[in-house]
Amino acid sequence: MAIRIMGTGSCLAEREVSNDELSKYVDTSDEWISSRTGIKNRRIAVTETTTSMAAEAALKALEMAGRAAEDVELIVLATVTPDYYTPSGACQVQAAIGADKAIAFDVNAACSGFVFALNIAKMYIETGFVKNALVIGSETLSKILDWNDRGTCVLFG
């Protein structure tokens, strides 16, 4: 059975923090960060939520795919930073985009979460249980980071 990705969408938090700005708060420098990670800037979720960014990206993906929210039968959201424990972020996205008939749940598997979510959707499609799935990865790590820990705050946003 041929399975394909029909559309993609993205959403970035509005606030951008440079290495120079970060060096005002922790013992680091642009040179130290970029030489070790290649990172120059990161995005910080101030007003955005995991769900709001996921919903925006989902709508863009549906538009690119030429599909309506009503066509979506499965929503899998990969995140370690849900807005709430319940309802799941996927259920919130489901309501936000109007995919009322979709099965919706979250996958919490850190960096590999999106890969697991994609594989779960693939298995649902291969079994014939659904035809159209929406797989989303969305994080707001900036809300849970220790901004005094140079070992992690330079990596995530």
Predicted feature residues:
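Cofactor-binding loop segments of dinucleotide-utilizing enzymes, especially the Rossmann-like FAD-
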Residues: T8-S10, V80, S138
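Short beta-strand to alpha-helix junction loop
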Residues: M53, V80-T81
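Acyl-thioester C-C bond-transforming condensing/cleaving domain
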Residues: E63-E70, D83-G157
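Short glycine-rich or small-residue beta-strand-to-loop segments that form or flank ligand, phosphate
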Residues: L74-T79
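Conserved "HGTGT" condensation-loop signature of ketosynthase/thiolase-family condensing enzymes
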Residues: M1-E73, I97
